[in-house]
Amino acid sequence: VRRVVRLLFCIFLVVTVVGGTVGYQLFTRTHDDPLREVDAIVVLGGEHDGREDYGIELARRGYADHVLISDPYRPYTEQDSMMPRVCSASTPDITVTCFEPHPSTTRGEAMFVQEMARRHDWREVIVVSWSYHLVRARFIFGQCFDGDVVMHAVPRDYSPNPVLWGAVYAYQYGGLGKAAVLGCD
């Protein structure tokens, strides 16, 4: 019994160290691409952490004249003023389109972007999300979107809590596995 417990502990330790080291490289280190002018800016769903305004700001800075904002938050609560505000932020120079992805996942967002790219003859997009989501989002967009993708993290700080990062790594690993199995069909 002790031998089995020791073996299981060693396996757990190796998996934790390897998973943490690889997770750090994949999900904690920056994987931003240099910004360049593209056909559209895509803001993926997630926390209201400034990503929506950041996507619109990138458009104002001239990187694109169309912003797609994923909007899986409907129906809105009375406290949620963010989405109604950003979804009505179009100007004469910038078109903001909010969309509800189906399915309500990164895959659904990438499939919608592919459809919009077909309609509008887009070849390049900037995708804005959390820094730790960029690797998985790049993988999924690579499956679902025929064009070039510039990945860029929303500028923000992240909690240094190792338990939180462990959960983030596990979620991202699971999401990568799911994406590898499901593909984009």
State each model region's role.
Residues T21-Q25, G55, G177-C184:
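Structural signature of transmembrane alpha-helix termini at the membrane-water interface
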Residues V1-V5, N161-L164:
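Membrane-interface helix-boundary signature
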Residues Y24-Y169:
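A structural signal for short, hydrophobic/glycine-enriched beta-strand patches
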Residues N161-D185:
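A transmembrane-helix-recognition feature enriched in membrane-embedded lipid enzymes
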Residues V1-V4, D49, R136, L176:
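Intrinsically disordered, low-complexity sequence elements enriched in Ser/Thr/Gly/Pro
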Residues R2-D32:
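N-terminal type II signal-anchor transmembrane helix
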